[in-house]
Each structure stands twice: as structure tokens, then as C-alpha cells.
């Protein structure tokens, strides 16, 4: 039914709903290094029981979680399904993009304060492949700098992230759309289609930087989540996260992905996507069947 991606077991002394949420001593000014405890879950849109792709891919979505001595880095990407009409597997582009980002981080070929640089270098490597890799993808990269306790993000398109503190959203990504249901995207097209296929530069990604605190919750996901679950539903699920151990985070990530997957196939549900469609003059109701990828992280004290 689902596949779970995990990374890291950190010493997490901040307990959700306790010190990290209410006590000023839990603020971002502590002297120790920070890290992320991350778990993930996802569904492919065309999921059938027992059929799962290997690796961190759910349908045309892809993701990665990587650790370096200077930072924890994670990302999600949503391959554009329209390429399938031209005989191209959309998951190849998104999957290769995320694997390249992961490798760059593990090799230390990045600057924590510049997540756009990770996207740019990865995209350039794809462009320089001897064997052409056609396709398009959105992308969202999140970097936690261990020593500065700052989160640096880059978001291109309609994947994105939320940062939750004290039960409220304190930071979130901005969705980037050219027009309805047409997000910003990185693309590689055949020569004859260059200038015709929609393609954005990594530099077009929305970039933010801000301090985080111990116990902050970071949810990074593709649009399959956000198109089917409004913030209030996500926050309701996050309230069930009572502590910051890995098993609890994994269970909550799974619960969020499962609920989004169920809502995606409810024809009577007025989903955020359906509401957005109505706002654009379309008579639409129901969830939006789509690939869903959820990475759920908690900021914790880091131990190597």
C-alpha cells in the first residue's frame, strides 16, 4: 500500500507540545548543532497492491534525504505526466534529478545557504548527459544548516513545504504557476521542441532563509498532498505527533499520506484543487488523483 523512506536517528530532547513549543529556552539560540529526524511515505497514482517501484519514487514523484557534516538536505520532485503521451517515462527525469541532488550533497558539492545552487548544478548535469534525458519536473529543496540553525529553501513549481511551530504554520513555500494547473518546471526537450516546451530556470525558484527551533515540524511534499489536504487537515494530523522519535514521525507521515490518498478518490469532496479550479471558472468537484510524496521532519539536537 505504501513505501516508507527513513533517515537518521538523532538525539531529540525537545518533546512536542512541551519544552520546544512553550519554553523560550527552546529557541533557535542554542549552542549545539541541529539536525533533522525525517520519515517519508508516498503513493503512486496508479498504485496497485503489491506493485511498488524500488527506491524513493512514488509514481512520477521522487525524493531524497541526505546528510552531510554541515547540513541535512532533503527534496521532492514531481515529474510532469504529460510526457507519457510522447513515449517518455516522466519518473526518469524527476528520479534522476533527485538522485543527482543527493549525490552532490553527499560529496559536499554544495553550500548550505544556496539550495538553488544544488538545483542548478543537478539540472546542468542532466543537460550534459551523453544520452538525452527528456522530461520535466517541479522541485523543492530544503537545507538545515547545522551550526547556524537556519533553514534554506528553494521551491520551483507547486511542490512545497510547511514549517509548523506550536500547532501553527509559521513558514510556507509560495506556489509558482504560469496559469491554472501549469506549474513552473525544469525541462529538457528534444531539439525540435526547444522553445515550445515550457521550461524555467532553476534561478526562477522561490528561495527563503529563516531560523528554526528545536521541535519545529517541517513537512515537504509534492502537490498530490497539497491539492487534496488543506492546511487545517494537515495540522490536525500533526497534532497526533506527541514526541520526536523516529517511529512516531514515521507513523504520522504514513497517516497524512494515506488520508490524502483516500481524499484524492472521493468524488464528493471539495478538495483544494477543486476549489482552485472553481476559482478559475471550471466546474470541478472531488479530489485530485495524483502521486503523493510526504517527507516529515523534526528539528532535533544533532549527534554524529
Curated annotation (Swiss-Prot):
Signal sequence bounds: none
One GO term of the biological process aspect: negative regulation of mitophagy
Binding site for Mn(2+) 1: 78-79
Compartments, record wording: Mitochondrion matrix
Keyword set, alphabetical order: Hydrolase, Magnesium, Manganese, Metal-binding, Mitochondrion, Protein phosphatase, Transit peptide
Regulation: Inhibited by sodium orthovanadate.
Name of the protein described by the UniProt record: Protein phosphatase PTC7 homolog
Organism: Homo sapiens
